[in-house]
Amino acid sequence: QFEAGDLVNARAQLEWAADKGSDPALRGLARLRLAAVLLQQGELDAALARLQAASSAAYRARFDDLRGDVLAAQGKAAEARAAYQAAIDALTAAGDDAVTLRE
């Protein structure tokens, strides 16, 4: 749904998966994608609420990266930069090559 541009249906399906899915890993992924939809819809506070805590270490960098995007959209440059740095730190801790994020 998201790729097709149908944000309303994508949001409904992702909300269900994030809140009621049986697999914790899939719930985490659904929360991440739901936050991206909310960002696209301009619902920045709701997007940030979905990103408050990564469901697992596997998603931590992605959550932090998207949190940076939401904070940047809110005009909170310093907080966004800190979130991007947290994403880089999570990637580094996981042994992944981190791409340097710039302003």
Q: How would you describe each model-predicted region?
A:
Residues S56-A57, A77-D96:
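TPR/TPR-like (Sel1-like) alpha-helical repeat modules
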Residues Q1-R62, R67, K76:
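Alpha-helical adaptor scaffolds
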Residues A73:
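Post-transcriptional modification and biogenesis factors for structured RNAs
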Residues L14, V99-E103:
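Extracytoplasmic/luminal low-complexity segments enriched in Pro/Gly and acidic/polar residues
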Residues A49, A86, E103:
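Charged/polar, solvent-exposed surface patches and flexible loops
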